[in-house]
Amino acid sequence: PMLVALLLASGLAPARPPLRQLAAPAPADAKARVLLAMRGGEARMSAAQAFGLYAPAMGVLTSNALYFSALPAVLAARNSGDLGPFNPLPSTIMIHSVFGWLCYGLAVSNPWIVASNLPGAGAVLATFAVMLPLMGNSHPALSACQLTFVGGAMATLCLWTGLVFAKVAARATLVGYFASAIFVVLAASPLSTIRTVLSTRDSASIYTPLTLAQCANTLLWTVYGVAAAKDVFVYGPNGIGLCLGLVQLLLKLVFPTRKR
């Protein structure tokens, strides 16, 4: 289903810029001023131009760091044969989130969004493929992960089936809503173990690299969305994700992971 969605995204991109195009093409003289400022010339880059260039460029790195963050832990768990306190639900949701954003980036022809999700797509698929056998038949999150994977795939198929009958101008908007909703669920998913964290006063189930990557990534994309792109599909879900990431970080500080 993910491959079908990507093929449709590339084919359904509207001939004219969509209603929510992230960044209108800059005039030639504006581009020249930006290049001159970057090379140390006399022209000065405005704050909006700086945010529009550096924030998404760094966001490409932090987005992929977010998607790659769980892979080392899962590979280490494969060697030991046990996932331990690792929460597998966020890694499952990441599959649908990365493909949702990748489809949105293709639909609105935004290279920043495509670059920030394309490498991560391989990482989340590898993480899930390694993680699933380690869960066995007795892992408490097995049913939730299976339901999330199948349910997300069916939701993606239903979305793209509906887009065939939607107007061209509405397609990018609908994909944006879909990707945003999944990302908010992803950002909140580490808190699925909050009851365990509070009862045991141990935040081991909240994976620190994922939390740090989420905070850095959502901060950069929120700044880019507000200052440069002015796109609610960028700053909306990322702003919510930043707040949820800070909650996770607070729990990590209040209830440190116990040494094992």
How would you label these PLM feature ranges?
Residues P1-A24:
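N-terminal chloroplast transit peptides
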Residues A24-A28, L36:
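Soluble extramembrane regions of membrane proteins in the secretory/endomembrane system
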Residues V34-R260:
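Alpha-helical membrane-protein topology signature
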